[in-house]
Amino acid sequence: SLDGVIQAPGGKDEDTEGDFTQGGWTFHYWHDEIGVLFTQVMSESDALLLGRKTWQTHGGAFEPMAEGDPFGDMMNAIPKYVVSTTLTDASAWRNSTLISGNVVEKVRALKAQPGKNILMDGSSALIHTLAQNDLIDEYHLLVYPIVLGGGKKVFADGTPLKLRLVEARPLPSGVVLTHYTVERPA
């Protein structure tokens, strides 16, 4: 959203933590270009990093999907890393590996491996932890023309970032596709 909220974009009851009642706020703004962006960013990545709630939401949608849906097949095939302090097993969604304890060091080790990008989706607490530890290189943000007035946000208070705009593209629905890289001191 314009005020940085990323909580429960996909459904009314997706994440009601903190008495959040605005779930499902992205549906009115869907445009096929959003799907194209998701597919493009996924194809440039060889791993998906998610917090537990986002992993459970996505897994509940994609794991039972029959083969043949191009995006569903891509989501099920990509290696997934779920960060959680409460899960003991990640077998509910195929190709998933559980990360618990010392998340920063484990993500740093993942980033050091050869390969393409590691994509994160949702997972505000995880985003905050990784940003505070300088482990995010790029942000692909969809900015929706709505102010929700509260909820979990993409950027944590007290964590300043300098970003460089790579791309901004408005869609007919009013959503703006943005791509930023993190500027680091030389």
Task: Tell me what each language-model feature is.
Residues 1-186:
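Enzymes that bind and transform nitrogen-containing heteroaromatic metabolites
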